[in-house]
A protein has these predicted regions:
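Active-site entrance/lid segments in N-terminal catalytic domains of soluble metabolic enzymes
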Residues: 2-9, 16-34, 38-39, 59-61, ...
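A membrane-topology feature that recognizes alpha-helical transmembrane segments
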Residues: 321-325
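N-terminal amphipathic alpha-helix/helix-capping segment at the start of soluble metabolic enzymes
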Residues: 33-56
Length: 326
């Protein structure tokens, strides 16, 4: 298996999806497609938008490429936390491989996208168009029944950089970007192959791909800096915000006892990460202030409390000094 991800042009992806469906009734190998309303999953609101199901993939390699997002959608996912981007990207960001271990509990030693930020942006736009197509053409659900939630890191300087700012603004309004125009044109050209998708459906696809953002900060990031970045994303960018918090908030003693009681005595970690990470006593009032700020701005704010938990690599499980339980 290659350790590099290769982006496929939108027209190729479009032909692949339509051709595979025509020939075998599957999408990227998925034959049992989920239709909204099937089963026990119920719709849910999310930060001003509508979710046909309250499930979907968290930011990871599974939300880096357009085809992975499509596969998640046809299997029932409707909430997509897009792979995190940061100022260091592409060839400048080395990720040791393999970077994921899931024999029992899941671990990883990777972080932000392995693509360039521009490539990541283009993958998300490709996926956005393909999901709108599949929703209508295969009658899988509403064209506004899924949500893309962008994810950025890891410090204020990087997030304010021209590269990341362009990414954020592009997902807020992609209408003037080259990839948007390319996808729109290709989809219009493919309409003769479609039974249900119309020109009006294509033109109705919203260029406001993301109205929400997830903030990921490094382990050890001070509370004041976290609050400053969160405030910037709400005040300056006008985005609904999710803040990632780490399980180290629980404290060393609680985490050690909980894992031991559950039989995970082989998981090894030290106290130092608990001491340098955001502390519970600082997190609670900070979250309260951010909730108040969001309300004053007419925005939504939430926290993700199960981000990454650093543990020691003792048996060569992954090619790094530490790995993160996810």
């Amino acid at each position: 298996m290659s350790d590099r991800m290769h982006c496929i042009p939108f027209r190729n992806l479009l032909n692949w999806v339509l051709g595979e469906w025509e020939e075998s009734g599957s999408v990227f190998g998925c034959k049992k497609l989920y239709k909204a309303g099937d089963g026990e999953l119920r719709p849910a609101p999310f930060m001003g938008r509508f979710l046909e199901t309250p499930i979907g993939p968290a930011a990871g390699p599974n939300t880096q490429l357009a085809q992975n997002i499509v596969a998640s959608y046809v299997c029932g996912g409707r909430m997509f936390e897009l792979k995190t981007v940061q100022i260091i990207d592409g060839e400048d960001l080395h990720v040791s491989k393999p970077c994921i271990l899931a024999e029992d509990e899941g671990y990883n030693c990777e972080w932000s996208t392995e693509l360039t930020v521009q490539q990541a942006f283009e993958e998300y736009i490709k996926a956005w168009f393909l999901l709108h197509l599949l929703a209508k053409e295969l009658s899988l659900g509403r064209q506004d029944g899924f949500v893309f939630n962008m994810s950025v890191g890891y410090d204020l300087a990087g997030i304010k950089s021209e590269k990341i700012d362009r990414f954020i603004e592009g997902l807020k309004d992609a209408s003037q970007t080259e990839i948007w125009k390319e996808c729109r044109e290709a989809l219009l050209e493919a309409l003769p192959r479609c039974k249900h998708m119309t020109e009006a459906d294509v033109e109705a696809i919203s260029a406001n791909v993301c109205s929400s953002i997830t903030l990921s900060t490094m382990h050890g990031c001070p509370a004041g800096e976290i609050e400053g970045i969160a405030s910037y994303l709400m005040e300056a960018k006008g985005l609904n915000l999710y803040l990632k918090c780490n399980p180290t908030l629980l404290g060393y003693e609680y985490a050690r006892k909980a894992l031991d009681d559950l039989g995970f005595t082989d998981i090894s970690f030290g106290r130092e990460q608990f001491e340098s990470d955001l502390q519970y006593a600082d997190a609670v009032p900070m979250i309260g202030r951010l909730r108040e700020k969001a309300a004053a701005l007419g925005l939504s704010f939430g926290v993700k409390l199960t981000n990454t938990f650093p543990v020691q690599v003792l048996r060569g499980e992954l090619p790094d000094e530490a790995m993160y339980m996810s």
